[in-house]
Amino acid sequence: HEAAGERINGRVLVDGSGVGTYLRHLVPLSRQAIGLDIEFPRVQESHAFAELVVCGAGEHLPFPTGSIDVIFSHEVLEHVQDDQATVQEMVRVLRPGGRIVLFCPNRGYPFETHGIYWRGKYHFGNIPLVNYLPRRLRDKLAPHVRVYTRADLARLFAGLPVQVVTKRTIFGAYDNIIERHPRLGKALRAVLQALEKTPLQRMGLSHFWVIEKTA
């Protein structure tokens, strides 16, 4: 809400809306909350929260140029086929002054949270140190998902009519740990969120960027 400002009251797009978690919170705040997801079963599910949810890909947004006030993209960019085209499309559909609120995986995080492929078999879980390997080897182990440095993100937005309003690296909420071990989870979250105010934020789970369209 804070990142979007008064724009939250306009037309809001959740790019990668999944089962509708964000839509549920945005519908009461906005003039129109729109969902987009590439998986049709998820589109059907999220219709429970918003009237307009479309099945489509981030590389080809089915919206007019300059028609959206805010775009939320939460841990989606790393999964699309073409992240450059996806970024360009988000910027295209934004109105001047509109904002993208973007979360995506940080290469500095000590774990690969999407699992890896090893000897042709997928291994689920948080795999340590994978993201610290040379890019070619890292991408061979995790070809199904990208990670980003700040420089990687800057290159994606280079040459586009935007300015970066917020550029941070954050740790997670660790809700799963809190659910199983409340005291430990809350203590861990407090410590890691305190690190967000130090140089160690570079080891955070995700990039949190707010990007504003300038023209």
PLM-predicted stretches and their roles:
Residues 1-113, 208-213:
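Conserved SAM-binding loop
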Residues 81-89, 99-210:
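S-adenosyl-L-methionine-dependent methyltransferase catalytic module, highlighting the catalytic core
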